[in-house]
A protein has these predicted regions:
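Hydrophobic, aromatic-rich membrane-embedded alpha-helical segments
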Residues: 18-38, 145-166, 271-291
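Hydrophobic alpha-helical transmembrane segments of multi-pass integral membrane proteins
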Residues: 23, 63-82, 102-113, 147-155, ...
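Membrane-water interface of transmembrane alpha-helices
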Residues: 31-44, 109-121, 159-175, 236-248
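Juxtamembrane inter-helical linkers in multi-pass membrane proteins
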Residues: 43-57, 121-139, 169-191, 244-266, ...
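Membrane-helix interface segments in multi-pass membrane proteins
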Residues: 77-106, 204-235, 239, 289, ...
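Membrane-interface helix-loop-helix junctions at boundaries between adjacent transmembrane segments
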Residues: 89-98, 118-147
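Membrane-water interface at loop-to-transmembrane-helix junctions
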Residues: 140-142, 146-147, 183-199, 262-272, ...
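Intrinsically disordered cytosolic tails
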Residues: 229-336
């Protein structure tokens, strides 16, 4: 069994972040892309698996170029449609059409960004000198994405766990390390129970809170406090179940990944992070980042027989537009 580990320090990350913020302010935001690449390079270099560390090869210039391409492909059309609605006196039917077109552009942005950002980040990541790659086609993911949301709406949310596992299967099974690919064996039925429990609990709590407010049974503030204190742990539990299920059903060769994430561990991580951020007014962000990295790498292992030394490099070309798409609306499509 081989495990992951993280060796970074919050103090080092804080020093880097202070310099990055200062340079970003001086350059009126232009340094943001170089700062992002610098932080990633540090985090990857401090992440190890089976004793060997990862490396990040992306550059600020590539991220900046990707951002410009994303602006041309999605940003300009989206903001142009918004500007037309705001500044032109248009008939109601035309205004509605522009709103629909803007929504479509935004809807298309998400799957395109997911695929292309993953493609870029994989090809800019290496381990033992061998790079990862992602070979899924954007058009195939678009079909999956449209179908998933359509069926989810038609089934009143019941199809959502199946959509999520199909999405994960696409991303994992099209990811390669050198010349060998990862595989995903999960199925939507495996997440149906956690999803149903979370959804039912959410509806029940919201209905009870709404009823209490309508009948003035309790103080409004106390009633609303019930929502985060009850639903927060439930949704953290669902997140943990999803992460564990995804990794437990991911294979590489004859070996299978395994995650030791539990609700208790994940809740402790998030509560500790929240306390650190509140007590330091956000200054503990570097330590929160280190805590997260150490937690998620430490709970992941690869079990079974696999000869990693036999993996060969397989070079593929990639585009940085996906990275720019993620920066464009700040949705943060990082590696799952």
């Amino acid at each position: 069994m081989q495990r992951g580990s993280f060796h970074g320090a919050g103090g080092t990350l804080l020093g880097m972040q202070i310099v990055n913020v200062c340079l970003t302010i001086v350059t009126l935001g232009a340094y943001h892309f170089w700062a992002k690449a610098k932080i990633r390079r540090y985090l990857f270099s401090q992440t190890a698996f089976a004793g060997d560390r990862f490396a990040y090869h992306g550059t600020g210039k590539e991220l900046y170029q990707g951002f410009l391409k994303a602006m041309v492909v999605f940003g300009i059309p989206y903001f142009s449609l918004g500007a037309a609605q705001s500044f032109l006196a248009l008939p109601q039917s035309v205004d509605f059409l522009l709103q629909a077109m803007a929504a479509l552009v935004l809807f298309l942005y998400v799957p395109v960004a997911i695929v292309n950002a993953r493609r870029y980040r994989c090809t800019r990541t290496s381990w033992r000198g061998i790079r990862f790659s992602f070979r899924g086609r954007t058009v195939d993911f678009l079909k999956l994405y449209f179908k998933g949301w359509l069926f989810t709406l038609l089934t009143l949310g019941t199809y959502y766990p199946y959509f999520q596992t199909q999405r994960q299967a696409f991303l994992h099974s099209h990811t390669y390390f050198g010349n060998q690919r990862f595989q995903f064996t999960g199925h939507g039925s495996g997440l149906m129970v956690p999803f149903a429990v979370t959804l039912f609990t959410t509806y029940a709590v919201l209905c009870l809170c709404g009823l209490a407010l309508a009948l003035q049974l309790t103080n409004a503030g106390l009633t609303l406090l019930l929502i985060p204190f009850v639903l927060g742990p439930v949704w953290v539990w669902l997140l943990g179940q999803k992460q564990k299920y995804y990794w437990d059903h991911t294979t590489f060769g004859e070996a299978r990944f395994s995650s030791s994430i539990t609700w208790q561990k994940l809740s402790g991580l998030y509560l500790g992070n929240l306390a650190l951020l509140l007590l330091t007014l956000g200054w503990a962000w570097p330590w929160v980042t280190v805590r997260n990295a150490r937690f998620f790498t430490g709970t992941l292992s690869l079990q079974g027989v696999t000869d990693l030394d036999r993996v060969l490099q397989d070079t593929t070309e990639t585009s940085v537009t996906g990275e720019g798409l993620s920066n464009l609306l700040d949705t943060g499509f990082d590696m799952d």
